[in-house]
Amino acid sequence: MAVGKEILTKIRSVQNTQKITKAMQMVSTSKMRKTQERMRLARPYAEKVRMVMSHLAQTNTDHGIPLLESHREIRRVGFILITSDKGLCGGLNANVLKKFLAQVQEYRNQGIEEEIVCLGSKGLMACQSIGLNVVASAVNLGDTPKMEMLLGPLTELFQRYEKHEIDRIHLVYSGFVNTMRQEPRMEVLLPIGENVIGDSAPKSPFSWEYRYEPTALAVLEYLVRRYLESVVYQALSDNMASEQAARMVAMKAATDNAGNAIKELRLVYNKSRQAAITTELSEIVAGAAAV
């Protein structure tokens, strides 16, 4: 019964793996719900800032703020690449990286260089492994990242845009559609215009005239920064919800596959045990007949 013992050992091993994947599935389900709740709570603030920025964009006023400049010749682009810090989430990171690398290659074909800020260790490791120009990063963000953790890398990129060292900034992340579907997204974060504000922003038939205190420049610079930060944080929240959903689905599939493997191994074990019993009975009968 050496074969039977080996099969039993395999069954126990798969059962232990199944317990782990089941636990990870339950943890991911809980984390996904919490992340969705954070997305819901942050949405009113983001929508209000977005609405004001939409009104400002519709005024077509030159406020003298580099972050509000709408037209530039593209010579160098920046990317904010958002990925997860951990794996075991299916093809989530691979799909985002595929979209990101395709855009990088398209720019390189036009002679346009890139500078990258990575939020998440998976994207950082991927960029470093192929020699891309990573200028800043933030990793190990945890389950409840604070905006303060992102300000350093983001400020680095925004300042380079203000100095005209970068002419466009893309935001790349996994968008949460539903539990079963997450899609890679790429948006133009800067310059601020229709690509970020227009289609989904509230439209109004009226013109807006704002009065600024203490000065228009001070208010607008502050508002634009808060707007950009809210867009990035919303994308990060989307990516985290996508990560937990993808991990939950992946772990459920792994748990189900482990269950199927256990059934097949038990069937093989029972067949081998039955064959061994049949052989022993045959030997007993043959021995009795010989006597």
UniProtKB/Swiss-Prot annotation:
Q: Which InterPro entries match?
A: ATP_synth_F1_ATPase_gsu (IPR035968), ATP_synth_F1_gsu (IPR000131), ATP_synth_F1_gsu_CS (IPR023632)
How is it placed in the membrane, per its record? Peripheral membrane protein
What Gene3D superfamilies does the entry give?
3.40.1380.10, ATP synthase, gamma subunit, helix hairpin domain (1.10.287.80)
Q: Which UniProt keywords apply?
A: ATP synthesis, Cell inner membrane, Cell membrane, CF(1), Hydrogen ion transport, Ion transport, Membrane, Transport
Transcription as a keyword of this entry, yes or no, is no
Q: What Gene Ontology cellular component terms go with this record?
A: plasma membrane; proton-transporting ATP synthase complex
Q: Which Pfam families match?
A: ATP-synt
Q: Determine if Transcription regulation is one of this entry's keywords.
A: no
Any one of the GO BP annotations: proton motive force-driven plasma membrane ATP synthesis
The protein's predominant localisation is membrane
One GO MF annotation is: ATP binding
Localization of this protein:
Cell inner membrane
Which CDD domains does the UniProt record give?
A: F1-ATPase_gamma
Q: Spell out the subunit comment.
A: F-type ATPases have 2 components, CF(1) - the catalytic core - and CF(0) - the membrane proton channel. CF(1) has five subunits: alpha(3), beta(3), gamma(1), delta(1), epsilon(1). CF(0) has three main subunits: a, b and c.
- What this chain does, per the record? Produces ATP from ADP in the presence of a proton gradient across the membrane. The gamma chain is believed to be important in regulating ATPase activity and the flow of protons through the CF(0) complex.
Q: Which family does it belong to?
A: Belongs to the ATPase gamma chain family.
Q: What is this protein called?
A: ATP synthase gamma chain
